[in-house]
Amino acid sequence: SSDAQLLSKVMERVGMDNCGTLVDFGNFCLRRENDERWGAPCVEEYDRYQGIEELMAYAHGVSAKSYAFDAEGNETTMDFPRILNIVRGAGFSGFIGVEFEGPDADPFPGMEATKALIETVLIN
């Protein structure tokens, strides 16, 4: 599901309203170091912004995955406002799940920061 173009073609062929995608902001790694499946660094990535744009046409859900924040509450590994504007521009009105996969042992501050950033961008 990391190759949005391929997944979009699958969705077109399925062509059923009850079949959709879960657009995950952090799921665009095409190949990892040593061809590992998980855990190894990503060495080839599908363009995140293009992928989100392509998959939003089929979105039944969105997973706002984050990894790191600066002192001002901005996600530092990707352009969250740009992504959320893609989601909004697609007319999505469903649920946005919150995920945090940062290095901290306690994920709750990261999830709270993610939620706050979503609210800041989408409400303002």
Residue ranges and their predicted role:
Residues 61, 82-90, 102, 120:
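Short basic/hydrophobic patches in alpha-helices and adjacent helix-turn junctions
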Residues 1-85:
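Acidic/histidine-rich catalytic cores of soluble enzymes
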Residues 107-124:
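C-terminal helical cap(s) of enzyme catalytic domains, especially alpha/beta-barrels
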Residues 13-18, 89-92, 122-124:
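Short helix-capping segments at alpha-helix termini
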